[in-house]
């Protein structure tokens, strides 16, 4: 099925209406303090619930009537049609001619037979793969699957890169309180030898299981690390007498007991030494940055168990259904996507902070960097024509309260407008008291205070009233009107985390639809990879390859050659 050209949002009456609205707000003067005072129902009008998550949009630079303008633009760019196309398997990944079906990864078994794409019953295939993963996970967790010496697995080491690493490591860190089988995980991604050296430090080879995650089983970084991990395992097992030196049969058995794969290239998997029966597949309609709930999450199923992984999937599906079935005017996923467009294209902001007030989410901003920036960091629309507006945002952040003592200064008093998402949960798995003070409430006090300070600021008169010397007053004034969205959950459970990830997946899709982007390809990573293959021979031995480089690259390589010590 051919994909229609994107609607040029900037040429629609709905875009013009938003521009007029923006201009009127600038003339009126944007003042959250004033808007709150004038409308006692502002918070109610700008608050939403989706699944277990609560959203407060009232501290954003919008009025309640802005939401209808957002919805109108979403309709104008045919968001509903593109959403239906994505959910039903139309090849909306135009440049790679692929369906985009991460939503199928979390559909319930009752949906088998309902989503046939390219002749494939997607839900049935997903459930069969999950059953295989769950059986494997149960075997590892119970001790039925052991290492080559018969000892229970205690550590799984995931080797992947990009979406094969960022998603699993983020979820592992986020859900650590749910690890209940005495199994921990480590994640190796960087081809830098330091990564593997540090991640294998202190590991017992007899109780370590490696999961190699590469759909094609040809990814340079992943396969390099996999081979190094295989060498490490065999050397360590030989050194401690677990296998006999030079015994190739024992080595082959050790690899089979200590390595499994997430890949569809069974020939390459077998060449590596992994039993192809211990390979878990996924499909070309699953993009890497949308794959944590596929077989890419096998390490998570092992650590947390199949039941928890199912809860995780249910959270995704909750938001999938909400997004697809809620009218745009009340659909907080759509509205948040449009809010990002509002700031990017009308306020001309380029940066978006994600500030989780939960230490377990410390890798969430890094995860969102790939999800959002690899998806929408593009200057060409899905039909090959240039974009007609700014696209993409720089996503970044750190957990509170750490960020408060690092970069919040810029958000509060800098010259840039930086919209920020504040994420927190009512309950903690680690309740603590400092005397009579509940420490989690002390923590959440900062969550509430920061959005209030950013919204309403502090005037010069308020600063003077504190007895501040006049010459210092300007430095202590806070302008306010710094926009934030508060996202509040009951607890950081597997279900809630699935909801949170799906939320941002669909926000990214909404933005990409407005901008006319194929949010599911990533050609920007290719050129550097191609050049690296050409340049690598020049680094140590090939003078002809060196001579073929530009002057700057030659100079850098010569510096390397002159100073290498190993």
Curated annotation (Swiss-Prot):
Localisation: Cytoplasm
GO molecular function: carbohydrate derivative binding; glucose-6-phosphate isomerase activity; monosaccharide binding
Keywords from the named record: Cytoplasm, Gluconeogenesis, Glycolysis, Isomerase
CDD domains cross-referenced by the UniProt entry: SIS_PGI_1, SIS_PGI_2
Any matching Pfam family: PGI
HAMAP family xref list: G6P_isomerase (MF_00473)
Species the sequence originates in: Bifidobacterium longum (strain NCC 2705)
Cited NCBIfam families: PRK00179.1
PANTHER family: GLUCOSE-6-PHOSPHATE ISOMERASE
Protein name stated in the entry: Glucose-6-phosphate isomerase
Reaction equation(s) it catalyzes: alpha-D-glucose 6-phosphate = beta-D-fructose 6-phosphate
The keyword Isomerase is assigned to this record: yes
GO cellular component: cytosol
Active site residues per record: 374 (proton donor), 405, 529
Record-listed E.C. numbers: 5.3.1.9
UniProt cross-references to PROSITE patterns, sorted A to Z: P_GLUCOSE_ISOMERASE_1, P_GLUCOSE_ISOMERASE_2, P_GLUCOSE_ISOMERASE_3
Function: Catalyzes the reversible isomerization of glucose-6-phosphate to fructose-6-phosphate.
GO terms under biological process: gluconeogenesis; glucose 6-phosphate metabolic process; glycolytic process
Associated pathway: Carbohydrate biosynthesis; gluconeogenesis; Carbohydrate degradation; glycolysis; D-glyceraldehyde 3-phosphate and glycerone phosphate from D-glucose: step 2/4
Disulfide bonds: none
Principal location class: cytoplasm
Homology family: Belongs to the GPI family.
